[in-house]
């Protein structure tokens, strides 16, 4: 009885583990490099009709805003070191 119960448990557990061993259909070029284009799409997107052709000015907007943010933060820190009070509004800092 005990061996039958153990055998049934082993069969049940192996049945649960089987899907993990299933082949997922990818053909990896190297370990971890398993990307494949969907059927009907080109191997390379650049230059194809699916290329989004981003405007460089639009792409640089975030970098520019980060530079401006860092400049404002630098002014806030310099003002805090001078006065000992933190002022969020940079326009008020330049007036001092």
Swiss-Prot record:
- UniProt xrefs under Gene3D superfamilies: Methanol dehydrogenase, beta subunit
Q: Which GO terms describe its biological process?
A: methanol oxidation
Q: What is its EC number?
A: 1.1.2.7
Q: Where in the cell is it found?
A: Periplasm
Cellular component aspect of the GO annotation? periplasmic space
Signal sequence interval, chain numbering? 1-22
Q: Which UniProt keywords apply?
A: Disulfide bond, Methanol utilization, Oxidoreductase, Periplasm, Signal
Cystine residue pairs:
28-34
Q: Residues annotated as region Disordered?
A: 45-75
Q: Out of the domains of life, which is the source? A: Bacteria
Segments of skewed composition (Basic and acidic residues) = 50-61
* Catalytic activity reported: 2 Fe(III)-[cytochrome cL] + a primary alcohol = 2 Fe(II)-[cytochrome cL] + an aldehyde + 2 H(+)
Q: Which GO terms of the molecular function aspect are on file?
A: alcohol dehydrogenase (cytochrome c(L)) activity; alcohol dehydrogenase (NAD+) activity
Q: How does it assemble?
A: Heterotetramer composed of 2 alpha and 2 beta subunits.
Q: Which family does it belong to?
A: Belongs to the methanol dehydrogenase subunit 2 family.
**Function text:** Catalyzes the oxidation of primary alcohols including methanol.
Q: What's the protein called, per UniProt?
A: Methanol dehydrogenase [cytochrome c] subunit 2
- Its gene is moxI
